Amino acid sequence: MPLPCDTILQAALIVTQDDARTVIEDGAIAIHEGRIAAVGQRDAIVGNWHGATVIDMGASLIMPGLVNAHTHASMTLLRGLADDLPLMDWLTGHIFPVEKGLTGELVELGALLGCAEMLRTGTTAFSDMYLIEDATLRAVDRAGLRCLAGEAIFAFPSPAYADPETAFDLVRAQHDRWKHHARAALAVAPHAVYTSTPAILARCRDLAEELGLPIHLHLAETATETAQCIEQHGARPVPYCDGLGLLTPRTTLAHCVDLTEGEIDLLAERGVTVAHCPESNMKLASGIAPATAMLGRGMTLGLGTDGAASNNSLNMFTEMTSCALLHKVHHMDPTCAPASAVLDMATRGGAHALHMQGIGRIEAGCPADIIALDLRAPNMQPIFNPASHLVYAATGHETRLAMVGGEVLYLDGCYTRFDMDDLLKEVRKARTWAMEQVRAAR
């Protein structure tokens, strides 16, 4: 007699991203109470399981939802606000002045727009660092994605706190509010070495230890940052942070562009995870992170889009393409960054960066965070190697379905938890606000 389950999901092809990287033709997944109960051939699953709901995606490819290892979701509201500038000019001359006027309502609106973009292009979980993160998590709660959120901690006031001394109490309060949420988690997120002091970074380390939270930090993004760190602290960013005890297996570092070979060895020894953001690094001309060297040392890398103000997209499929192509031409070696390794970064590596066990793969016992791509799209045929298609051919807009915890959040152009037309009306109003902030800052 078939076992009961909530949902049976069927499709022409399943890319599991399990340890064996199994690919199943004419497959199905049994889902019960938000988790994958079984995955296998369609006939076997249908014969052994009875689903209260059956979703037949037909000529689609099912795979784990992508994981964005580093972004600032609310910065969708600043997309295209300032382009073609070096990082520090972009930040201090354009982004920081506008962000001074942010409110919780605006952060929530921008985060919801970011969630919509991510679902539409196959991302079901993300690591966020921004301002007024309670508002980001309200958007996450509304949209249904998973999120590791970190309130950016600075050595100066932010829209979330007038006094940096109160930032730590704010993070504690956020942790208390969200620690039992099924899809949200908190990180301690000192923004960067150049926006912090040694005392603030040490307190971030202590707070993370106290609450059992991971650390999320921008580090070694540019050579300018390195020079400034040497001038102010007498050390390069990586050894400086190591001396403060910030580099642990619970730490994810965004960017890590300007590294020495010895620093790569140190990061590998400490078990740190790196969120590689190739498109943002290219657009800001920050440099090229030594991703292949880090992978060669056995490090875990996730893939991140960074914010839509510096990318200008939250599309993880295009990020995968850029990652693979960038490292091939940088090293003049077509074997660098193979499709399988880049796909791992966008799934399993991202899951590791978010410290969320089981996502980024499709196998029994894992959360049912799943997407389906339309194989009827001309660019998706013929299929010889699914990983190749996902990294080099897919655009993200083939996404037909996005599911988190067994719940359908997006299906064939429709969002199940919010109205996109209503959201866009509010976004257009926010554009007027952003333009006013720009004028006031000049």
Curated annotation (Swiss-Prot):
EC number in record: 3.5.4.28, 3.5.4.31
Swiss-Prot/TrEMBL cofactor(s): Zn(2+)
Keyword Metal-binding attached: yes
Record key words, sorted: Hydrolase, Metal-binding, Zinc
Residues that bind Zn(2+): 70, 72, 218, 306
InterPro entries according to UniProt: Amidohydro-rel (IPR006680), Deaminase_MtaD/DadD (IPR023512), Metal-dep_hydrolase_composite (IPR011059), Metal_Hydrolase (IPR032466), MTA/SAH_deaminase (IPR050287)
Binding site for substrate: 99, 191, 221, 306
Co-factor binding details: Binds 1 zinc ion per subunit.
GO molecular function, one term: S-adenosylhomocysteine deaminase activity
Reactions that this protein is recorded to catalyse: S-adenosyl-L-homocysteine + H2O + H(+) = S-inosyl-L-homocysteine + NH4(+); S-methyl-5'-thioadenosine + H2O + H(+) = S-methyl-5'-thioinosine + NH4(+)
Database matches in Pfam families: Amidohydro_1 (PF01979)
UniProt function note: Catalyzes the deamination of 5-methylthioadenosine and S-adenosyl-L-homocysteine into 5-methylthioinosine and S-inosyl-L-homocysteine, respectively. Is also able to deaminate adenosine.
Family: Belongs to the metallo-dependent hydrolases superfamily. MTA/SAH deaminase family.
HAMAP family linked to this entry: MTA_SAH_deamin
Protein name: 5-methylthioadenosine/S-adenosylhomocysteine deaminase
Provenance organism: Nitratidesulfovibrio vulgaris (strain DP4) (Desulfovibrio vulgaris)
Phylogenetic placement of the source organism: Bacteria, Pseudomonadati, Thermodesulfobacteriota, Desulfovibrionia, Desulfovibrionales
Gene expressing this chain: mtaD
